Amino acid sequence: SDPSYSLEVADQIADINGVEGEDGPVITTRLKDYRGYGYIALSAKNVNVGGDPSSQASKDLRKAIMTVIAAYRDEGIDSYYGDTATVINYPISNTSWAAPSVTDDGYQIAYSTDVDGNEIYTSDMKSEDKYAAALQAALGYFEAAGYTVANGQITAAPAGAKMEYQINIGASGNGDHPSFQTLTNAAAALKTIGFTLTVNDMANASDLFASYQSGAAEGWVAAWQSTNDPDMYQLYHSQGATNYY
């Protein structure tokens, strides 16, 4: 079987066993490394400036949104999984031999540079400082994308772009998903600078799948699992059979 695990499940196991920890008189738990990963995506077709998904302005728009989302990943994953999951910066599980390592030349934290290519974060930043730095970097990306920015606020969108976008997530309609807190916190942060990110919690998983498989979704949350010998080109090349995983 492939059971779902979270801090809530761990608490339930402890309650059933009557003791703290993974093992007890009723349930014995063994956690194993897993090649699966979850991700948050934006559709280039639906989130762009002026109908040109590949323009620099369109890329800057998507980077603005994702820079803020990425800043809240650690908090969201920690609250859901504790130390049983880690944040990844490339679309492959850290349990795979093919995953980039932090010691590799050129390794970067996802969405950690500003519009000028400078590092957003420093090693001594506290969480609140990190969130503030991400918002400041996002403003730079929004402005580069053609948004009107004044006094730390976004006041108008360029032609062919919007002040609000939506991300669909299958959190059972009640927020039960490891990425839900990440998104809601990012949405709250973006709201403070005048931009609306709507988090659409879809109770029916089939509706979520249909929203991105049909190409209708602006953004979505899903998951994938790499094979023993992963072919990332096949999976992510834009001219392949599908690149939404």
Predicted region positions:
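Structural recognition of the beta-strand scaffold that forms the well-ordered cores
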Residues: T29-L31, G38-S43, T67, G76, ...
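Short secondary-structure boundary/capping segments
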Residues: I13-D15, G82-T84, Q234-G240
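A structural "hinge/loop" feature
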Residues: A41, G50-S54
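Periplasmic binding protein-like
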Residues: S1, A189-Y245
